[in-house]
């Protein structure tokens, strides 16, 4: 029978438990309310099935010059230009890929009416890098969002 010294077993046991947090990933760590880098809006990220989505829950300027709630006036689809910006689902179909990354999603920019491929990375508990791009990720722009409310 093989005899393994007690000290080796103890060290192996401690290493296994010390490494456990490195492998345990919180797929839902992204859930909550996030403020855009410009500070002009907040998006609530939520989960539907196994994918992640986001909707506008706050706008710095919620109303147009006439005092009416702002709408999606820059949307290329004319029939959607009257929908309110507040409540608009502007993030969709993100998949958790490990290493604090959610990818293969889409982001809609109501300022331009454009829809982009998008990846997101949680760099710390309260900082989210949101990268919108056309085609490949190197042809894009990254915005840094800050957590406002964590999902309870």
Where is each model-derived feature located?
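Cleaved targeting-peptide boundary
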Residues: 25-31
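Structural recognition of beta-strand segments within beta-rich domains
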Residues: 35-36, 137
């Amino acid at each position: 029978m093989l005899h393994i010294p007690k000290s080796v077993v103890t060290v192996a046991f401690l290493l296994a438990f010390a490494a456990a947090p490195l492998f345990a990933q919180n797929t839902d760590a992204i859930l909550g309310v996030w403020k855009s880098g410009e500070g002009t809006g907040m998006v609530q990220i939520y989960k539907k099935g196994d994918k992640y989505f986001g909707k506008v829950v706050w706008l710095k300027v919620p109303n147009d010059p006439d005092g009416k709630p702002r709408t999606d006036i820059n949307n290329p689809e004319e029939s959607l230009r009257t929908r309110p910006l507040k409540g608009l689902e502007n993030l969709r179909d993100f998949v958790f890929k490990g290493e604090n990354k959610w990818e293969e999603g889409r982001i809609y920019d109501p300022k331009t009416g454009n829809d982009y491929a998008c990846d997101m990375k949680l760099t710390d508990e309260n900082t989210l890098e949101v990268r919108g791009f056309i085609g490949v990720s190197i042809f894009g722009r990254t915005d840094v969002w800050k957590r406002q409310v964590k999902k309870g």
